[in-house]
């Protein structure tokens, strides 16, 4: 993302999460966007969708920016495996250059496949395919042996059939000013949540009926050699913390809650890291980054860089509900 785009994004974020009313021009564009969203969803609801013959779980959100979808997808893959399923993941591959269904490997180029799909493959080791056409990616993942499809960030991709919809909500920022793009952060109206199967609240206070998810990460891993160190070991040191994710404040808050003192550096989401980003950091100063950023920094070979793996801990009631839905599918009962 260019510097000018980063400035625009920061300005929009201020509009979306401020109490003041956004400018009239943004509100007018928002009404047009809302009409287009309604037409598109109506079209796909009226027209029959292709059946994939296996259950499809869609994980997404209403808001643009990071809400914690990727850790949840990883947790879902692990949960499904524990209960005898063979999950495969499909994604558009944000900012990736792939146009046809492309399998993601642990050594894939994030510029080609996207950083989230690459992280999912590295963490789970299971089949991950990316394509702007998720139905094609789903067929590819089924051919690779999957018997359940998990779609990363596919809530608004209505061409893809789905049996379970999971919407992730930022429990602190919630829905901002509650407006649709570009006047607000929403891709769809809040009322859309009434039709999903699960609303998962990441941090903050959950609303009625929402499942709770917390992200846990107390260990740092040196990018250059894999050395692991408790984050508490960095207490009292001079530290730089960098994040090029949708909501960097969450990462910084996590470090602060662990008692670390650091200089925060926020980059635009999906920032492409280069050695220049670290030139101003003193040679003896550790740099803490997110696990998602780490997939784009592996070629830098900089011993100062440490990343923090996080894992999603889910509400105890979540797994039985999800598995019950999938078991009905296994016994020939669709969830539609």
From Swiss-Prot:
Gene Ontology terms, MF aspect: ATP binding; tetraacyldisaccharide 4'-kinase activity
SUPFAM superfamilies (UniProt xref): P-loop containing nucleoside triphosphate hydrolases (SSF52540)
CC annotations in GO: plasma membrane
EC number from the UniProt entry: 2.7.1.130
InterPro entries: LpxK (IPR003758), P-loop_NTPase (IPR027417)
Record-listed ATP binding positions: 63-70
Keyword field: ATP-binding, Kinase, Lipid A biosynthesis, Lipid biosynthesis, Lipid metabolism, Nucleotide-binding, Transferase
Gene Ontology biological process: lipid A biosynthetic process; lipopolysaccharide core region biosynthetic process
Keyword check for Cell inner membrane: no
Enzymatic reactions: a lipid A disaccharide + ATP = a lipid IVA + ADP + H(+)
Pathway terms, separated by semicolons: Glycolipid biosynthesis; lipid IV(A) biosynthesis; lipid IV(A) from (3R)-3-hydroxytetradecanoyl-[acyl-carrier-protein] and UDP-N-acetyl-alpha-D-glucosamine: step 6/6
UniProt-listed PANTHER family: TETRAACYLDISACCHARIDE 4'-KINASE, TETRAACYLDISACCHARIDE 4'-KINASE, MITOCHONDRIAL-RELATED
UniProt similarity note: Belongs to the LpxK family.
NCBIfam families to which the protein is assigned, alphabetical: lpxK
Free-text function comment from the UniProt entry: Transfers the gamma-phosphate of ATP to the 4'-position of a tetraacyldisaccharide 1-phosphate intermediate (termed DS-1-P) to form tetraacyldisaccharide 1,4'-bis-phosphate (lipid IVA).
Name of the protein described by the UniProt record: Tetraacyldisaccharide 4'-kinase
